């Protein structure tokens, strides 16, 4: 927890309009109303149990139903069994219920939920509803934007279910609390002259989990850089590093690459 405290105190001392499009976590802000976003996420992770790396691919479609509600569907692919194959999919929804706006800042809060289905074998104690586990999650997220800095934090409850024919091991805890802290700063441009300008954002995110049955936990740090092109295209590049863990995990450190394009006013 000392890592979170240091970074949080550092960020609230900054006084420097930032994007709230984080790489690893979702902010309280929503996708633009009437928009449809298409994203392809990829990760290349070090396999902790075998030689080589683990590759995950996740195509996603996001729909901004209105200014307060968005939904997303995802598919999960992995090279787990010596070849890229479909492992499952998921659905995500987020409802923004609080907005406080000022001249150079705003505050948002939202509730979110996720359901995932996965047919992979269960190899690890950590619960991952975006890659390895079936289950559901519900939580809250708050995001503060101050000038060029965005700070976002979330807390959620997750429960893992059986992965099709692979039953969740009884010796492992299947209930978890997830928590995140994300900080992003707009690095370029220093001053806007056109909405077509490429935005460059630097970010640092902390992602953690505690299994409620046994108290085991982990915390990862994820620095990243993001490019937003013509206000529609987005490229994210991130590196995840485990800070500590008392949980067995199949993959800890690795690289993430996400490509996204947003179509505006599709359903308005």
List where the protein language model places each region.
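Residues that define the transmembrane beta-barrel architecture of outer-membrane proteins
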Residues: 32, 53-57, 84-89, 105, ...
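Membrane-embedded beta-strand positions of outer-membrane beta-barrel proteins
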Residues: 38-42, 73, 93, 109-113, ...
């Amino acid at each position: 927890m000392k890592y979170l405290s240091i970074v949080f105190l550092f960020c609230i001392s900054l006084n420097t309009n930032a994007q709230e499009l984080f790489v690893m976590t979702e902010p309280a802000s929503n996708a633009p109303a009437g928009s449809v976003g298409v994203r392809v996420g990829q990760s290349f992770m070090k396999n902790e149990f075998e030689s080589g790396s683990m590759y995950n691919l996740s195509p996603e479609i996001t729909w901004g139903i209105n200014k307060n509600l968005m939904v997303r569907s995802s598919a999960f692919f992995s090279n787990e069994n010596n070849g890229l194959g479909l492992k499952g999919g998921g659905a995500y929804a987020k409802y923004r219920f609080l907005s406080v706006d000022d001249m150079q800042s705003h505050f948002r809060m939202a509730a979110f939920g996720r359901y995932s289905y996965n047919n992979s074998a269960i190899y690890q104690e950590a619960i991952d509803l975006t890659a390895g586990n079936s289950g559901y999650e519900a939580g809250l997220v708050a995001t503060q934007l101050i000038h060029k800095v965005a700070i976002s934090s979330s807390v959620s409850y997750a429960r893992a279910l059986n992965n099709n024919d692979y039953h969740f091991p009884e010796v492992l805890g299947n209930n978890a609390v997830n928590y995140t802290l994300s900080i992003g700063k707009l690095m370029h441009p220093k001053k806007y002259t056109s909405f077509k300008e490429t935005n460059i954002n630097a970010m640092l995110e902390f992602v953690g989990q505690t299994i409620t049955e046994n108290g085991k936990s982990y915390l990862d740090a994820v620095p990243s850089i993001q490019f937003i092109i013509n206000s529609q295209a987005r490229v994210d590049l991130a590196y995840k590093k485990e800070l500590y863990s008392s949980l067995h995990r199949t993959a800890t450190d690795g690289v993430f690459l996400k490509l996204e394009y947003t179509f505006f006013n599709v359903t308005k």
